[in-house]
Curated annotation (Swiss-Prot):
Residues 143-306 are annotated as: Serine protease. It is found in: Mitochondrion intermembrane space; Mitochondrion membrane. The chain crosses the membrane at residues 68-86. It comes from the Eukaryota. The gene is HtrA2. This is Serine protease HTRA2, mitochondrial. Its main location: mitochondrion. CDD domains: cpPDZ_HtrA-like (cd06785).
Length: 426
């Protein structure tokens, strides 16, 4: 484009050189066409008019070309610059799947799944109404998680542990387009770790629900969510097992066969969808034990929860089940069964070889008693108040005790440590 603009300018100058712009009575001075020959000579008598016609006139030949160039060169450069801006925008075009060719078109099945369902995934923030940011004056974020829209009128599905057991908090939902809305908790089932939220907005993109009963080990799946508050994050993997019983995981009072996957699921992924290659949710991301071992609640189990919740809402009552409210510590935990311990020891050299039981601290809520006391994700609880901890039920029993403080023995890597926590009363 720059060469084309320069060629047009040269052509214009050559055309102008053939015109007689005006006649001068003064003796003409010959100036070479390219401006390189500046020899000045007196014209012979009778040849002034002819030379003026050839050169374009006396005064114009002295001053006109410079003015012409000063005017048209910036004009030409401006045209070139504008053309370069257009070309720059074309450097990052939006490419649709149909426009792709070769292996990109044939094997980008993960991208096709994400394009079809990412708009229905939301980011959930739990705001602490007692603590405010110094600069903005807004409540600080105590924890976060994910969810996905299941009804166009604003019904959102997530994990119960994402939104409950946090006193003095409010729930806020951010959509994929950046809009943010306050949310109300409608239905909670702590036994299955499921909950629904409602935001006051309509015409939303909805996630289609599939069938987890048809899944096979080895199937490709995609986990969507907001790990570490990074919205719309995508990880992929396969189904490792479709029948991982809750008893194997040491989960209290639950009768669920979890989906095990090697798709990366972290704290912010909790509550987000686990999606098959048809773009259907076949599970709700629930927990991660270690790299390559994560679990999701099967969508068939979720459908039962949603049906019961819908029936209760028709009767004008929310669907809430779960454990009696106990003192609040602020952790999400997982019992270390022999199978899980074997996997952890095979993947990490920081795991004590003589460890036979305990409870893994999977998540610590910011600002909670556990956070203030020094517990960290990845810690393994072995004793509370000198009592041996073998599973998560032992931790619940310790919370039900009347002890004001909990003296907790943990393993952080291979190092044994003591932390003291003061649980909050309900």
């Amino acid at each position: 484009m720059a060469l084309r603009g320069s060629h047009r300018l040269d052509d214009f100058i050559r055309r102008c050189s053939a015109l007689t712009l005006f006649h001068s009575q003064a003796p003409s001075r010959r100036v070479s066409h390219c401006g390189r020959d500046r020899r000045q000579q007196q014209d012979p008598p009778g040849q002034g008019r002819q030379e003026q016609q050839e050169s374009g006139g006396g005064h114009w030949s002295r001053f006109g070309w410079r003015s012409l160039i000063r005017f048209f060169v910036p004009f030409s450069l401006g045209a070139v610059a504008s053309s370069l801006v257009i070309k720059r925008e074309e450097l990052t075009p939006t490419i649709t799947a149909k426009a792709m060719s070769g292996r990109r078109r044939d094997f980008n099945f993960i991208a096709d799944v994400v394009a079809g369902c990412a708009d229905s995934v939301v980011y959930i923030e739990i705001k602490d109404t007692r603590h405010f940011d110094y600069f903005s004056g807004q409540p600080i974020t105590a924890s976060n998680g994910s969810g996905f829209i299941i009804e166009q009128n604003g019904l959102i599905l997530t994990n119960a542990h994402v939104v409950i057991n946090k006193p003095h908090t409010m729930v806020q939902v951010r959509l994929s387009d950046g809009r943010t809305f306050p949310a109300t908790i409608e239905d909670v089932d702590q036994t299955s770790d499921l909950a629904t939220l409602r935001i006051q907005v309509s015409n939303l993109s909805v996630m289609r629900l599939g069938k987890s009963s048809t899944l096979r080990s080895g199937e490709w799946v995609v986990a969507l969510g907001s790990p570490l508050a990074l919205s719309n994050t995508v990880t992929a993997g396969v189904i490792s097992s479709t029948q991982r019983a809750s008893q194997e995981l040491g989960l209290r009072n639950r009768d669920i066969n979890y989906l095990q996957t090697d798709a990366a699921i972290t704290f912010g992924n909790s509550g987000g969808p686990l999606v098959n290659l048809d773009g259907e949710a076949i599970g709700v991301n629930s927990m991660k034990v270690t790299a390559g071992i994560s679990f999701a609640i099967p969508i068939d189990y979720v459908k039962v929860f949603l049906e019961r919740a819908a029936e209760r809402r028709k009767k004008g009552a929310a669907y809430k089940t779960g454990y009696p409210v106990k003192r609040y510590m602020g952790i999400t935990m997982l019992t270390l069964t022999p199978d899980i311990l074997f996997e952890l020891k095979s993947r990490s050299q920081n795991m004590p070889s003589n460890l036979t039981h305990g409870v893994l601290v999977w998540k610590v809520i910011v600002g909670s008693p556990a956070h203030s006391g020094g517990l960290q994700p990845g810690d393994i609880v072995t004793h509370i108040n000198k009592k041996e901890i073998k599973n998560s039920s032992d931790v619940y029993d310790a919370l039900a005790d009347n002890s004001k403080h909990l003296d907790i023995v943990i393993l952080r890597g291979v190092k044994q440590m003591h932390v003291t926590i003061t649980p909050e009363d309900p």
